[in-house]
Amino acid sequence: MSEGNDQDAGKGRLSLRPAGRMELGRTVDAGSVRQSFSHGRSKVVQVEVRKKRGLQPGTPSAPEGGSSSAPAPQSGNAPQGTPRSGGGNRGSGRGGAGGAGRALTAQELAIRQRVLEQQRVEAARREVERREQEKISILSAAEEARRREEEAKRAAEEEARRKEQEEADRIAAEAARKAAESAPPAEAPPVPPPAQRERTAAPSSRSAPSRTAPSDDIRRPSRPAPIPSKVPVAAPSAPQTLRLRERGDEGEEERKPRRAGGGGAPAPRKAAAPVAKKAVAEPRRGGRIDVRAAIEGEDERTRSIASMRRQRDRERRQAELERLRADQLKVVRDVVLPETIAVGELANRMAVRAADVIKQLMRMGMMATVTQTIDADTAELVVQEFGHRVRRVSESDVEVGLEGISDIDSDLQPRPPVVTVMGHVDHGKTSLLDALRATDVAAGEAGGITQHIGAYQVTLPSRQKLTFLDTPGHEAFTAMRSRGASVTDIVVLVVAADDGVMPQTIEAIKHAKAANAPIIVAINKCDKPGANPGRVRQELLHHEIVVEDMGGDTQDVEVSALKRQNLDKLEEAILLQAEVLDLKANPDRAAEGTVVESRLDRGRGPVATVLVQKGTLRQGDIVVAGAEWGRVRAMLDDKGQQMKEALPSTPVEILGLAGVPSAGEPFVAVENESRAREISEFRQRKIREKMAAGIAAGRGTLEQMLSRIQAGAQKEVAVVIKADVQGSAEAIATTVQKQEHEEVKVRTLLSSVGQISESDVQLAKASNAVLIAFNVRATNQARELAQREGVDIRYYSIIYEVADDIEALVRGKIAPKQREKFLGYAEIRKVFEITKVGKVAGCMVTEGVVKRGCGVRLLRDNVVIHTGELSQLKRFKDDVKEVARNYECGLSFAGYNDIKEGDVVECYETELVPA
């Protein structure tokens, strides 16, 4: 063996002999294993195992000098507080000897007390610090325990993953070993010289070995030697690596085959198939350090599988930490909440899942679905729970900024006054306006009364303009008078000199005071023989109207519309009052005003009479009037002439609206159609909701309806109202509602303007309603349908006729009432007991008559003790129909026998009378 080693050394081959050329160092342990060959042969070979260096991170390696010793304390630095040997003892001795028999002075005592107090304060401070330190220690210990628990949990998970990986590696290694055993044994070829080996290293390692060498020394097993499962770790004190190089080729990069012993045969190689499988199927095992890698010269420090696992675990934990941080950094949003919102829409606005919103609602005790609608308060609580900001909005926000900004004084210009003429019916309001306008409107009015609100503009000889609103005086037109007073600047109160103050005059005074409008009293009909203007002034005092003649500040003018007397004085009074008010408006802005009246014209469609109060209305403007909108296609004045623009205080008729707006609604010009459509849709939706709520409230609960039907009290009169203008339809609806009775309900199914159509007839037929047509007619198709279906269409032109007919209808629905009629009294003089009949009272009729079958009340001491009917009425033994006063008779009561002498019988009968 030694000769072989020397020979190998001389040839420049590897050797395991511990000579000066090859050193294993302190990181390699040597051992021997027995290799088994074919035909029962075996041989002992030497094996070197490279040990893994087990350095802990952060631990410095020991110095090469060997053992390390702690630095000795310096002798020159003495501890603080240690008395010096020498003078200290001497001084102490002197102090002790000098102060043994002397008392402390006051200064020394104060110093000592101060020192003791400082010591107590210091002790208290240290105690507080100790307690705080204990609290911190407890919290730190809890945090450390939690951290250790988490680390233990992670370590357990890593250990489980490691075991699974090791089991997979073991199964793969076992499969590779079985594949290597099943392969035929391979023989190594002879080792070529170094120069030739450098050229043919790669091809020869893959070629099949020759089988012509019969010597046992050169035969090697086909499988490598077993590797110990646990490789001992080298001590960290000697950082050395195993480098196996040829004697003369230390710088050569090519790896040389290993020599097992003294023979010159090359080291055995593994079969090609297992090597390829290992390189392809398990690439992660390429960095593992084994015996073969150490022998072949793979001396670089590569990363182990455990290190790679730790790196992957660190990366996974880092990614998990970043994900958790991303979840914690939530985006706070401004969530806009309307009055009602669906659950799904709320989730979308918060950018969360709808399921999370539903869970939160369930925690709040509310079961909801994705499509269910919740109110704004509940939605606000949910948004706050998710950590977002809430911004509440209302559907009415679409009207914000609709009226524009306030005008500045420099933009204001004088405007004509708006004068409303009010008063009682038939006091001459329209005639007075006709006299001022030089027209004859009153002659064409039905019934001689005004039933529409009219708007006119008069130009005086002085070129000044006055705008007049003529309001109806009938009691049914309260809403019209209220609208006129709300948009007016001056109220002209017309009172007939021969009639005085009447109910509608009082109502007009209240409307004017509510609108805070000044009043000018026009005492009309002063040309009539019975005129008494003084009485009118006296009656006005009862309503706090004090004219100037009586020391007040209210102007009064005695006029005659028929004779056109003092009309100029009335105009002067109006102009004077307007000058006092100093009326101004800004014409250079979007138009605003009020709808005075509206109607549905057959040829022109919806027509609205509006009064411009601010700005200038031009043809082509987009306006919103109440719940309707449209573009102004045409404008007409009170004389029917076309206009291009309307300045403030100008009444005009506008065409082009989508529908008939309600009278009294404001109108405003907007910038575009989308804004107008949005506002109109919002207002129409509000009207529908209000109507639905009113219907539901009027209907009541199902139990209430059933109880009314069973009691026979569910009676109603249904009406469908069609009028020429919106104000008349409104007045008729109000008049109809006033005719209600406690037993009969009057219900207005429809109140609109325009002709009667087939749909109106069908509605009246379905609900058994009366169709009221006020100043309108039915179409031919509607008339024929009404005749076939038997629908009653009633035409009217005067409003009080409508009120009379509806009152008659309601009275016809009321059931007749029972009225009690007194007959007489009878006094019981004697009581008889008769078999099979019971007690019979012998009576004397003291007042009136007693009739058979009448109702009776039995009075005892003026207290009613029984109410019933007479069963028998006899005189002596004969049955009679009635007994007159001062005659005796016998009475018996149906089902009652508790009668005594001295009781009084009151007799009466009931009769039906119409309600």
UniProtKB/Swiss-Prot annotation:
Gene Ontology CC terms, in alphabetical order: cytosol
Gly residues: bias regions: 84-101
Chain segments carrying region G1: 423-430
Residues at which GTP binds: 423-430, 470-474, 524-527
Organism: Granulibacter bethesdensis (strain ATCC BAA-1260 / CGDNIH1)
Family matches, as InterPro entries: EF-G-like_DII (IPR053905), EFTu-like_2 (IPR004161), IF2_assoc_dom_bac (IPR013575), IF2_II (IPR044145), IF2_N (IPR006847), P-loop_NTPase (IPR027417), Small_GTP-bd (IPR005225), T_Tr_GTP-bd_dom (IPR000795)
Domain tr-type G: 414-584
Domain of life: Bacteria
Feature: compositional bias, Pro residues: 186-195
Localization, UniProt: Cytoplasm
Chain positions covered by the region annotation G3: 470-473
Sequence segments annotated as region (Disordered): 1-105, 121-295
Protein name: Translation initiation factor IF-2
Chief location: cytoplasm
Chain intervals for the UniProt region annotation (G2): 448-452
Skewed-composition ranges (Basic and acidic residues): 121-135, 143-180, 243-256, 279-295
UniProt keyword annotations, A-Z: Cytoplasm, GTP-binding, Initiation factor, Nucleotide-binding, Protein biosynthesis
